[in-house]
Every structure is written in structure tokens, then in C-alpha cells.
């Protein structure tokens, strides 16, 4: 059983339909992905990102994935880079200003002080962050991140690291691309699976203690 538990919800991973998966070949990369403000390539079925600038250098899907989405992948920094494994969903791009528009952004070893967290673009007024002293540069991590009607979460190696409820969820009918960000770093993303989340209510209560 690969269920993921967040507050009052159980995500049924194995029952969540797969929307996108498989090795990223040069043909699939050209067909399925777009690049902005960075160098993104594919190698041995993985996405490779390189961006020396302090900004959002992204690779994003050409197609949209409306609804509640789970981003499931393995990510690592490429040494000597030491920070920022970043993933996005409910994403749109502001072509006029060449900037990220609406999106939920999850980072592992980000925010300058080594944190794992979630933030909402483009205002960045909604965020939840926590230290991740367990992170080791160059080590591969299994990241599972997504949202259910604005209830955002990120698991790393099967452990819930942080969750956040957005009182004004992004409209996934309008903003529904997915992608990855290299922020002044080099990263590798492999074994990507995009799923439509199937979940069930999981009422939680305390057992009496006295």
C-alpha cells in the first residue's frame, strides 16, 4: 500500500490514474516540454536543469493537467550544486513579462537557509517552510508533491515534510501546466509520474489519554 496521509485525507496513490510517465527521450523532450530562462536537456531518460542565475529557470509541460495533481519523481542536485530541487504544478507562464504566473512551488533545500516548503506564485505571500537538516547535496530523494483543492503537501522519501491549506486555491481549469525549476543550481529529475489524485476522507480524532 502506497497511500499518503495528510490532515483528514488519505491519498490513494495506486488508484490515482497516471497522466504522464516514462523516460524522457530527446523526442519526448521536444514534443512535451518547453524551457524558459535556463538550460534544460534530457540525458538517460532524465531531465537535467542548469541555471547560474538567481531566478526561475524552468522546464514546463506543453499540455495542461487540470484537477488535483500529484507530482511523483526522484530528484537530486548535481554537484557542486548544493540546493534547490524545485517542482511546480497548477502552473501558467506570463509570456509578456517572461515570468512565472500562477503556480504552487515546492522546494527541497531552498529559500537560502536550507528549507523544505511550499509557496504560491506570483505574489509569494502564502508560504510554509521548515528546515531540512537531513538534506545531503548530490543524494537522490523521492519527492511526492501536489494539492487537493488547495490543500498542498510535500513528502520526501515517504515522510510528510510540510502541508499548507490555501484559502483561495489556484483555478486548475486555467492554470494547469507542471514543471521543474533550476534556481541558481544544477539538478536532475528522473522517473517522473504525474497522477490525477484519488483520495478519501480520513477523519482524525485523539484517543483519550486520561
Where are the regions a protein language model picked out?
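Short, aromatic/His-centered strand-loop micro-motif at the edge of beta-sheets
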Residues: 120-142
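Secretory/extracellular carbohydrate-interaction modules
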Residues: 51-118
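Beta-strand-rich interaction surfaces with strong enrichment in secreted/lumenal proteins
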Residues: 57-63, 129-135, 178-179
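Short, exposed beta-strand/loop patches in secreted or surface proteins that constitute
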Residues: 37-43, 62, 109, 145, ...
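Carbohydrate-binding surfaces in secreted/extracellular proteins
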Residues: 23-24, 73, 135-167
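Short carbohydrate-recognition loop motifs
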Residues: 38-57
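Extracellular carbohydrate-recognition regions
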Residues: 1-35, 201-210
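Flexible glycan-contacting loops in extracellular carbohydrate-active proteins
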Residues: 164-193
Amino acid at each position: 500500500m502506497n497511500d499518503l496521509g495528510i490532515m483528514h485525507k488519505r491519498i490513494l496513490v495506486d488508484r490515482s490514474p497516471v497522466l504522464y510517465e516514462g523516460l524522457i527521450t530527446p523526442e519526448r523532450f521536444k514534443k512535451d516540454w518547453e524551457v524558459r530562462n535556463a538550460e534544460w536537456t534530457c540525458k538517460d531518460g532524465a531531465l537535467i536543469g542548469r541555471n547560474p542565475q538567481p531566478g526561475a529557470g524552468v522546464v514546463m509541460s506543453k499540455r495542461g493537467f487540470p484537477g488535483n495533481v500529484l507530482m511523483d519523481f526522484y530528484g537530486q542536485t548535481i554537484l557542486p550544486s548544493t540546493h534547490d530541487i524545485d517542482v511546480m504544478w497548477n502552473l501558467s507562464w506570463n509570456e509578456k513579462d517572461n515570468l512565472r504566473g500562477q503556480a504552487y512551488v515546492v522546494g527541497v533545500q531552498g529559500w537560502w537557509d536550507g528549507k523544505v516548503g511550499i509557496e504560491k506564485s506570483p505574489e509569494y505571500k502564502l508560504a510554509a517552510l521548515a528546515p531540512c537538516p537531513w538534506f545531503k547535496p548530490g543524494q537522490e530523494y523521492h519527492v511526492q508533491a501536489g494539492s487537493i483543492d488547495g490543500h498542498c503537501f510535500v513528502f520526501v522519501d515517504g515522510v510528510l515534510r510540510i502541508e499548507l491549506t490555501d484559502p483561495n486555491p489556484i483555478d486548475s481549469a486555467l492554470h494547469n501546466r507542471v514543471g521543474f525549476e533550476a534556481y541558481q543550481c544544477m539538478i536532475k529529475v528522473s522517473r517522473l509520474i504525474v497522477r490525477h489524485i484519488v483520495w478519501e476522507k480520513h477523519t482524525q480524532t485523539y484517543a483519550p489519554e486520561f
